[in-house]
Amino acid sequence: RVTSHVALRDVSGLLTPEGVADAAKLITDSLLAAGKTEPRVAVCGLNPHNGDNGNYGNEESTVIEPGIALARSRGCAVDGPFPADTIFVRAKNGQYDGIVTMYHDQGQIAMKLMGFERGVTVQGGLPIPVTTPAHGTAYDIAGRGIANVGAMKNAFDLACRMAAGRHTRS
């Protein structure tokens, strides 16, 4: 995502073309590290219906599109911006390998709905692979014998693939 854990009211002011391009590069590099040879990345718009030609905001044309152009100039295969309410379906159907979102919940809600028990969060841009189950720590069920280990196993497996990929490329 372009912004981190910030209030929704602050997101628009924190978006920059450079931030969009950096996020696209980060997800591209993370997908390469995970073994995708030609990652395809989509970028979400910020506003409903991508701003509907400025009726609901103009960040898509003033910030996000220039960021996409910058990402392409850096070698990223990136498309968008797309409305957030439809792009995740296209990714789930295999058209895209990763999605750049503008803020935290824009991506987390979709990811958790598509696979709460399987989802993995990757902390990209670090010298070593860092992955965690997307659902978080689950302290509320710790020690009760009811946890599903699927997301933790996927996080571990992905970290191993990323480490192996970094080893073979260096």
Residues covered by each model-derived region:
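Anion-binding alpha/beta catalytic cores of soluble intermediary-metabolism enzymes, centered on
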Residues: R1-E59, E65-S170
